[in-house]
């Protein structure tokens, strides 16, 4: 059958390719010339600022360069498309892929050879050549994962990328002006691969998709700190101050010339390179106790008088270090909500447990304008006590607060969330999706991620699937049926011309998702474990069942924004919308614009039953 042929192709190619690519990681460097690059002409600006916030800081005499996201591009092969792929491929890309795939397999030697040669694989209708684009944020550390955008080659006859698997792919600097072999030349800066997510909603282009967290950066991407007035002694002074604050090993700052320093994100900030970028420029060159005392007083007066924006002040407090805590702690009780939050934020980042208690109060206070930020700040803390106040917020009346608390707790692997991973049918080493069961009170909620990792979170206690159930996908690839309220839900799939065995599951959302997403293999009793549907198809089924009331829950899809690529602004927001298209919905290969914050569009609707009336 079609699915069987796709599985055979992947079985023969994927494991060997994965081993070869892993063995080759770390052999490549970022594109950089052998000598320091020419120093950019400084912009027309004052060399030294005089206001209380900036005067004496690194920001007063420098500016950061290389802060835009860096676009990477590569060409790869998606397998597992049945007969919906194509053999269309530009000759230059075809030659490159054939050579690359051959080299990756050759070192294995002595093992099982693939059933198809690279050329035959490219020509198969089970595969499609795609352009792969990813964005590396400023200051990204080595090993950081990035989302990928995939597009079928323009002009090809590929019908869809849904259900496919991107074979290991090389990513290089994206030169939009490059043509011919120039498109595939340059150092390999990242590796890519994984299951493809195609938006299941009607407006999406099935020839475009995402691989969530599918790119891995080979080496850290440094920043450059440019001196407005080049001076090597000053550059060295800044180097010493930065390394003193963030630790000399591994080396964070290096004065390359009189005109600039290079900065690498320290390990403590690996998950938040934007945090480091905003903090480092707020360092003051003078670190003597007398200066610190005077500076704290200046900053506090300016903040409480409303003379400055509070976000930069909070970074300045944090940059001064733990010596500021005695002056900062009285502000935890400030009458001004903004001063209170930002003082507590700075204190929490300086490991003050009293500040965490204040953030917990803000997070729990309905109506506080900094509530969502407090939840995220608690989630970013490494302190074990920071997660405790987040658990009750899973049941909060505010949907955004519930989701933010879940995201924070999930990052900490908190026991309040039980995670069930499901492997990819085409390659068991890859992840199809993760089901997070969030045991909490409050209205049932289904939350779907569209960045970083394919995750579905189900909020509630034993969220039911109401009968009668009848769902059939438009292409008849999956069918769900249940007649009685207490009856099990019957599922089966169509693989080519063959029907799968039936699966019976209790009428609960957790059981239903497991049956849809798990691999189609027998369990210990010989029964089929799952249908092996791709993440996008699982989301599509859930969306329809939530919309018609079969599942009494809202379906909320994470909405990506410019923040996901560039990092948060001074007051970050991650809007969430109901039934907003997941990744790949007509997304151009470039950073999206910051979306407006939307109200929920899809509340849980009562299911209509002609015989019994409204549920």
What are these regions, as identified by a protein language model?
Residues 306, 335-336, 366-367, 397-398:
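Short inter-helical turns and helix N-cap capping residues of alpha-solenoid HEAT/ARM repeat scaffolds
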Residues 224-244, 248, 337, 344-347, ...:
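Ordered, small/hydrophobic-rich secondary-structure cores
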Residues 21-24:
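C-terminal motif of bacterial Sec signal peptides marking the signal peptidase cleavage site
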Residues 290-301, 322-333, 352-364, 383-395, ...:
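Amphipathic alpha-helical scaffolding segments comprising HEAT/armadillo-like alpha-solenoid repeats
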Residues 310-320, 330, 340-352, 361, ...:
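Structural detector for internal amphipathic alpha-helices that build alpha-solenoid repeat scaffolds
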Residues 265, 332, 345, 363, ...:
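Active-site proximal loops enriched in glycine and acidic residues that flank catalytic Cys/His/Asp
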Residues 26-73, 79-298, 304-309, 320, ...:
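Beta-strand/loop-dominated core regions that host nucleotide or nucleotide-derived cofactor-binding catalytic loops
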Residues 2-14:
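Bacterial N-terminal signal peptides that target proteins for export
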């Amino acid at each position: 059958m079609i699915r069987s042929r796709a599985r055979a192709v992947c079985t023969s190619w994927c494991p060997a390719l994965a081993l070869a690519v892993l063995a080759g990681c770390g052999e490549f460097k970022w594109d950089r010339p052998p000598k320091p690059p020419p120093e950019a002409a400084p912009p027309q600006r004052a060399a030294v600022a005089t206001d209380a916030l900036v005067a004496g800081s690194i920001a007063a005499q420098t500016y950061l360069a290389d802060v835009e996201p860096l676009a990477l591009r590569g060409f790869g092969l998606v397998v597992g498309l049945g007969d919906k792929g194509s053999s269309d491929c530009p000759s230059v890309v075809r030659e490159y892929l054939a050579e690359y795939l051959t080299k990756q397999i050759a070192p294995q030697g002595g093992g099982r050879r693939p059933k198809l040669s690279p050329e035959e694989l490219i020509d198969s209708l089970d595969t499609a050549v795609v352009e792969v684009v990813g964005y590396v944020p400023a200051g990204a550390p080595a090993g950081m994962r990035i989302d990928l955008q995939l597009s079928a080659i323009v002009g090809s006859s590929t019908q869809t990328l849904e259900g496919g698997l991107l074979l290991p792919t090389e990513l290089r600097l994206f030169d939009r002006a490059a043509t011919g072999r120039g498109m595939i030349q340059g150092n390999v800066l990242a590796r890519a691969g994984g299951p493809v997510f195609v938006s299941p909603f009607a407006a999406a282009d099935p020839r475009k998709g995402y691989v969530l967290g599918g790119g891995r950066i080979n080496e850290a991407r440094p920043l450059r700190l440019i001196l407005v007035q080049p001076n090597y002694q000053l550059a060295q002074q800044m180097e010493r101050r930065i390394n003193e604050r963030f630790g000399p090993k591994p080396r964070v700052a290096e004065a390359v010339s009189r005109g600039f320093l290079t900065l690498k994100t320290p390990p403590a900030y690996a998950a938040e390179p934007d945090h480091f970028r905003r903090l480092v420029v707020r360092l003051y060159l003078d670190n003597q106790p007398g200066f610190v005392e005077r500076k704290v007083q200046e900053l506090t007066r300016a903040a409480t008088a409303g003379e400055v924006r509070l976000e930069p002040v909070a970074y300045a407090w944090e940059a001064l270090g733990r010596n500021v805590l005695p002056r900062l702690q009285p502000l935890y009780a400030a009458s001004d909500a903004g001063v209170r939050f930002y003082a507590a934020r700075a204190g929490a980042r300086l490991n003050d447990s009293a500040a965490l208690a204040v953030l917990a109060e803000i997070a729990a206070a309905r109506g506080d304008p900094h509530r969502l930020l407090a939840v995220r700040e608690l989630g970013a803390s490494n302190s074990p006590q920071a997660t405790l106040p987040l658990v009750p917020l899973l049941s909060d009346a505010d949907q955004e607060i519930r989701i933010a608390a879940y995201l924070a707790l999930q990052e900490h692997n908190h026991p309040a969330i039980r995670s069930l991973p499901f492997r990819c049918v085409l390659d068991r080493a890859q992840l199809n999706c993760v089901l997070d069961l969030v045991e909490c009170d409050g209205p049932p909620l289904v939350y779907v991620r569209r960045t970083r990792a394919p995750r579905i979170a189900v909020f509630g206690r034993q969220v039911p699937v109401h009968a009668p159930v009848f769902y059939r996908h438009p292409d008849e690839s999956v069918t769900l049926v249940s007649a009685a309220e207490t009856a099990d839900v019957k599922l089966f799939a169509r693989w080519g011309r063959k029907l799968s065995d039936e699966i019976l599951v209790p009428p609960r959302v957790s059981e239903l998702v497991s049956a849809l997403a798990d691999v189609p293999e027998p369990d210990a009793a010989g029964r089929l474990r799952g249908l092996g549907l791709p993440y996008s198809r699982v989301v599509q089924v859930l969306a329809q069942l939530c919309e018609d009331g079969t599942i009494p829950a809202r379906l909320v899809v994470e909405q990506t924004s410019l923040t996901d690529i560039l990092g948060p602004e001074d007051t970050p927001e991650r809007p969430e919308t109901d039934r907003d298209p997941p990744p790949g919905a007509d997304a151009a290969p470039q950073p999206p614009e910051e979306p407006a914050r939307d109200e929920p569009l899809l509340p849980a609707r009562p299911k209509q039953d002609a015989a019994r009336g409204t549920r």
